[in-house]
Amino acid sequence: MASGDVIVKVADKETLDRTYANTNAILAAVGEDVRVKGVKRYGLKINKNDSNPATRCTYLFDAVGMTPAAMNYSTGAFDFGDWGDVFFVKNNYPAMVRYDGTEDYKLDPNDHTKKADGTTASDVANTAYGGNAMSVFDGSSDKGKIWLSQFEIGNYEYMIISNVQYDESYNDDAYVREDGSHADKLYYPMFGGSYDGTRIRSLAGQTLMYNTNASTEITRAKANGNGWNIGSWSKRNLLDCMLKIMSKTDNSQTAFGQGQTSGYVNDASQNYGHLATGALTNKGQFFGYKDTTHEVKVFYIEKWWGNRWDRINGLLMVGGEILAKMTPPYNLTGKDFEKVGITFASSGSGWQKGTKSSRFGRIVNSTGGSSSTYTCDYFWWNAGITAVALVGGSCSNGDACGADCLNLSLSAGLAYWHVGASVFLEQPIAA
């Protein structure tokens, strides 16, 4: 045999037949497994060098060719495009949830003042009810949890959602309980947090809670019972990604509604202009207005931006350096948080321009944009303190508000007219 000759060994027929049979068996098993057979990936690629909030976004994987979702301001109806039957949209529903975490009953999706039967009155505005109105994302059984992958390559950022953990880059941080176990459902508040004298509530027809510091907000949220707390960065980031992928734009206000971003009055007797909760109980899963005087609603959640700032866990600025913790337990000092690789000097503010996508979500890393470019939202920071994240903006912030609107300039001890928090729930572990 000459040097350099290649030897190819061919298995005998019996071995080949066994391999063929085994392969067919594996493929058949995979075909019968809905969780594998029905794998979906909906991705968005964002060009950092394109300042246009719409053209900078390109669909990837199963999202390619889909019509984006957006509010139709001419008809006054939300247009789901091709997204109405996507798992994280169709498996989202409004429900009343007891303090112990038990789902009591579903609400009529188009009129939350009624139960799902469309006739029986609900407790959505009943302060005597022992629980809260929550937006539920059901990932149980074969429905599929919302797995998220975020990263960047060169001048492109990527956010991809799947109904399975497609590979190791996909996380379910928003589902992680304080004991480290993983839930199958997510519970977001349908309404901005109000206060009943004991606890933060998510109910319609209530005055928003404000002028509270972080410790008070957390204490009042936890007063609902085990598993209740204020919001977190991982939950905020996940839902923001869902909105961006659905709408194929970085301008959340154009796609979903401006939100109440005006109306401030310097009068405590008028609650400084904050709208009461429940303005959109008869407006379905998504709804918004082009003007600045009405609420916005996404995934049955009112006030995702505007009206009042919401303080959240899991994102801090300590000495100018942004730190994140994607799963509980949380604290207000930065202990056990991780560096996200973004640092700002001194203090300041500006329209967001650059953003960084990583395992820690998508976070602003430079300013210089405008209300109609890049993320179209504003950022405040203070490098001289330990700042706790505020998100969404208030009724005095105008175009600065939005899904990406972020404030890292105020300490945990700050209590002010435009700051409060809302109540979230981790799914209880089944008995």
Task: Indicate where each model-derived feature is located.
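Short, polar loop/linker segments at the starts of domains and inter-domain junctions
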Residues: 53-67, 150-165, 197-212, 401-402, ...
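Short, low-complexity N-terminal tether/leader segments at secretion or assembly junctions of large
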Residues: 1-33
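C-terminal, surface-exposed recognition/capping segments
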Residues: 40-50, 235-237, 261-273, 281, ...
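A short, polar/charged loop-to-alpha-helix boundary motif
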Residues: 318-329
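GGW-centered surface loops in extracellular recognition modules
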Residues: 34-136, 142-144
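Carbohydrate-recognition beta-sandwich/jelly-roll modules
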Residues: 71, 133-180, 227, 347, ...
